[in-house]
A protein has these predicted regions:
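A beta-strand edge to alpha-helix "cap/lid" segment located at domain peripheries
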Residues: 2-47, 55-146
């Protein structure tokens, strides 16, 4: 990202507009900004938007991770190891329920070849005094039907 783009803090604080931004647009922008960093080997974008009490599931770990500290420790083990040349955020949908929002999407990433890794993601965001924060993440891999 270049320096003209909003920072994570701008997103978490509703782009500095006093909370008037469309929550759907803000949440999808937050996710894209974190995924942009993820693809460059930097998981900090997700750590920065995770709530202190976040819970996390993915297919590469045996148990749920509880809390931002546990998530940060897990992500440190993969820092610098992820390289995504491009990705597609397919059919993102945000469903608002009070001060919570559920983001669902399919994620297709490419790592320097045309081989695609396909994922499903569900994230639950909570609106707090700090803005929107992720309180639950669940990633699952789409296995080939071949």
């Amino acid at each position: 990202m270049d320096n003209m783009e909003p920072s994570m803090e701008d997103f978490v604080n509703d782009l500095g507009d006093g909370g008037k931004a469309d929550p759907t647009a803000v949440i999808i922008a937050m996710e894209r900004a974190a995924l942009d960093r993820w693809g460059k080997g930097d998981p900090s974008g997700f750590i920065e938007i995770a709530a202190p009490d976040v819970v996390y599931f993915d297919p590469f770990i045996d148990r749920r991770l509880d809390g931002r500290e546990a998530l940060a420790a897990y992500y440190e083990g993969i820092r610098g190891k992820v390289s995504v040349s491009r990705y597609e955020l397919v059919n993102p949908r945000v469903q608002l329920v009070g001060s919570a929002a559920v983001l669902t999407f399919n994620y297709v990433s490419y790592s320097g070849s045309e081989y695609a890794s396909r994922w499903n993601c569900t994230e639950v965001y909570r609106r707090s005094q700090n803005g929107w924060e992720i309180i639950q993440t669940h990633w699952s891999y789409q296995y080939s039907k071949q």
